[in-house]
Amino acid sequence: MGADIFITEEEAGMTEYKDMDVGEMRELYDELARQYERYCALGLELNMARGKPSPAQLELSMPLLDCVNSEADYLADDGTDCRNYGVLAGLPEARALIADMLDVTPEQVVICGGSSLNIMFDTIARAWITGLGGQTPWSKLDNVKFICPSPGYDRHFAICEHFGIEMIPVELGEDGPDVAEIVRLVTDPAVKGIWCVPQYSNPCGYTYSDEVVRGLAALEPAASDFRIFWDNAYAVHHLYDDPTLQDHVLNIID
């Protein structure tokens, strides 16, 4: 059955789409349509959504549904009444929890919404509309560029695409992006930031070396509103329980 469905090695090495004539494109389209129909005939029910926890993982959070009731303690460590509006930087217990996970101090943590991607989008939108650090809003500039270690996370790149930001690819190696190239690029004042997934980088799984982290922290960009988007999404998502087999990226704040 697999031989009838999947593209053969010969097809995988086919001519690139841009080099095909109309006849070749029609022939390929017909073949792919036939493969699609064979997939449909299998009657599979597959959820192809990315990043969804399994039922077993969801079970881990079940006790959270029972930990708050009318008899629970509703005062935070600093006396904040958790039934009321929150405090700007977040509850101290939450800041301490995240600080421990990210190897930083609670004072370096601000609790925002539950979606880091939404926070990153909003930060770019704020830079676009009002500017950062008192600088000109990016929307009023002739050109805005972002450094994009590649391969990288497509949702980062989609944010740039949404705002019309020019993306500059920089090769991602096993120890992180090419710092020497980044140092050269940030001499351009139009370069406003860089996307980074520093630990188990999506999609290759690379972790930035200490040398790379220090190099990024020491950047002297021409743009005073240059920002490093340090999307450490996999800080606690280790593949192995054995600590000796786990990666721990250097704390860029230090």
Where in this protein do the model-derived segments appear?
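Conserved core of the PLP fold type I
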Residues: 80-224, 235-253
